[in-house]
């Protein structure tokens, strides 16, 4: 029985030493960094940061566009209400008894003002959309460009031993960059 325990301990020691030697070899491979690969990964990191900031700006522009549309709609709704009240008052006092009894002049004026307000609201909403469409499309294009730059700038390795890249691993994703330097160590 002791003989089997001794053999098991020897095998365990051999496996542990082999793993330690392999770990040292992979660390020495990682220690010899290629400057071009490191610069590429730094470019990828910066591109990911810029891409994230651009996404935040895109969200703010979309939010601001929506808020401006709400404000424009509210202001124009208030203008329409005040205009209809003013037309009612003017139509009843100036138009005389016949116009106030029939109310045709005031109704026609009210319909005309409502149509003007609706037209101006549609024009202002279109103007707000047009004003924000170009910067928003430019921001989306810049965000896409930085994502493409981030994925192309850093050559991702296939394994944790550094094969295929200057760093052990470089994973460029939409949520950030993860650098794995050596086996099990993340920076």
From Swiss-Prot:
It is found in: Membrane. Its main location: membrane. GO terms for cellular component: membrane. Residues 1-18 form the signal peptide. Keywords: Membrane, Signal. The keyword Isomerase does not apply. InterPro entries: HAP (IPR005566). The keyword Membrane applies. It comes from the Eukaryota. To HAP-S protein. This is Plasmodium-specific hydrophobic abundant protein. It comes from Physarum polycephalum.
